[in-house]
Every structure is written in structure tokens, then in C-alpha cells.
């Protein structure tokens, strides 16, 4: 990750170590901040503090010198090896197919404690979203994680006599619209804010996330774009508390229209707004695999249409969406898109990938010096309180810029056959991490 030829997304995982610059930019032959005093110890020396250093460095995998055998400036061989997984963990990969899934067998060389890793085989199966519940009922699938589709949850809730059940917990996931700040109408901050005020997110949630159990809550409108399971800022992100000075986009059609009026976007004879000869046209790009689009797209069509927006939606395969929004040569092909992100940890640093100017997932192409300064202050410190305060400022600043609009946070449901037990999952501890205690009760 410190090599100058590294093309991956995780260079920030090591760029704060002593010797990084000398290795990455100079002629140093090794990173001086990494020491191995014996066969079982790795010592890291940091050039500057980083709030997530312990978790970031602590999850790096240990592998053989054979796998990492390469010359500086030539990491291509290491990258090729990424498609040939190795390891000394409790399971080993038996087969893998991009179209069908994967299978893993228990590693006979792994010394597990008594009672751990009782499941001998794991099969990860690619299924159609429209038939996965039927497969769960038929027994061809035993476990479906991270379900937020109300219809599927309702089906399992009714089918408990068929041997099905579910677990639930607050999700680390936040779904969001992101707006293209580099091309098209959404370059104008006023347009972004108007679109935010003009989308009734509460109505969307009530329509899409509707459980039969009236006391159960599946989703909520987040307050800010950020990590919903943040150790310090989760209440602000989830909207349970208000942050001082933050912009909150409660549905307000008249306010949205006024913002556009004030910004010079006037309604033309055809009902579509325009400014300086440019029509207020929004090209919406979304993944067709997402069931939510059947609800969201008609709502955006109607509600943004009321603002004088020429709305055009296009759905395509998820991977095509990602490649399109990430391609600078295609920056004029879309204006707004929809994605979700699972933050996986209680640290705020995961948001850097999206809203930092050089963030690898900054699909909105947001660039703001003030925002970057808050993110840097939050990341490069060892003071937990100072980090939380800086990230909250970043969340508030991003809300004002409105490149990312959080649409829904959810309660995650994991649907399973009752015979699968011992999966002690949570928002930051997924099923694969829980295999030590999982077992099949036949």
C-alpha cells in the first residue's frame, strides 16, 4: 500500500507511518516505521497520530513472503495474487465463480477451541432477489443477511411455522442520493439544495418500508450524511439530535421553488426551469437490482417535476452504475444517483472515502477546502473528543454543500432457517465474523 505503483484504494491506511514518504516518493528500500523484532511481533511507528490507527493497522492480514515477493515499483504480481486467496484461518476457499458464488470448507489445519467452528461447509450462493425468500422457504438457502425489503420481512414473519425466523439490529448502513458537482445543473449548490427540499423522504420511507407489525420500525430519515453507528456522532447522523448550525432538508416545496427562483432558474413556457439557456434537466442513474427504485423513481419524477425539473431516469446493472459515476470521461452522462454504504465500524473516518476531495468514492466530485480541513483534523489526531467534534463540523459543512443527501437509514433484518443458531450478529459484527459460535441444530 505504500508502494508508488500501488493502484488500490487503501494508501491512506499507511500514509501516516514513519518512512512512508521516503518509500513512496523517494529511493528508500523499506518503510522505516514498520519493524518486526521477532517472528510474532510487528511494531508500527507513526509520523503523526491517526484516530483509527489501531483498527486500521490491526486488521492487516499476515501472509507469506512468497505471496508478497515483488520489487519496489512493481506491485502487479501482488495484485494478481488477490484473485488467489490464501490464509491460515478457520475456512479455506474451495471454489469461486463471479456468476454463481463461492464455497468454503473448514480448514483441517486450523486449531479451533472446543465447540468453535462447528459448521463444516459454507456456500455463498448468488440468487435472484425476486426468488430468494422462496429459496429460504424451500431450504436451498439457510441465511439471507442485511434485508431491508419490507415484503420479504413480512413474509418471513408470517412463515414462522415453516421453520423461519429473523434477527434484527440497527444497521451501519446509510443510503443516499449523490449529486454531480462537476457537470450539469447540479454544479449549482442552489439546485442541489432545492432537490433536497423537494424530495419527501418521509413519504418515501412510509411507502417503501412498510411492515405489517405496526410496532416495528424498519427505516428512518437520517439527519446528516455520515456514519449511523459512529461512537460519538451517531445520534446526529440518525437525526435523534440536532447539530448546531446544520441544514436539515425537511420536505418543503415552496422553499425549494424559492431557492431556484433566487438562483435565477426561471420557469419556461413548457414548465421546465432554465438559466442562461440551460434547461434544469436531471439525469437520474440507479441500479436496477434495487427494489427501492420502483418506489423512489416515480416519487422523484412527480415531486421534482413540480419544481420545474425535466427528470429522466435510467436504470442499469449495479457494476455499470459504479463504473459510470466513477468515470471522469462519463461525468456528463448523469446528474444524480443513488447508493448505500455500510460503515462497518464505529469510527467516523469511513466518510472520508466519500466527501474528502481525493476520496476514492467521492463520486459527487465534491471539493471544498473547509470540509477537507475538518476531515483532516478529525482523522489525524489521537484525541477522541477532538476527532468527534471535527467530524461533526464536517457533517454539518457537507449538509450545507448538499452533494450527498441521506435518504434512509434502516433496521437490518437477517432472515434464517431456525436450525441456524449461534450467529451473534450486530451492526459491526457480521455473519462471517460470527462463524466461531454458529452451528446447525438438526
What are these regions (language model features)?
Residues 165-179, 356-359, 367-372:
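Periplasmic-binding protein-like
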Residues 29, 57-116, 121, 253, ...:
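Gly/Pro-rich hinge or "lid" segments in bacterial periplasmic/extracellular proteins
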Residues 3-69:
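Surface-exposed binding/hinge segments that line
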Residues 199-238, 292, 297-301, 326-442:
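Detector for C-terminal structural segments
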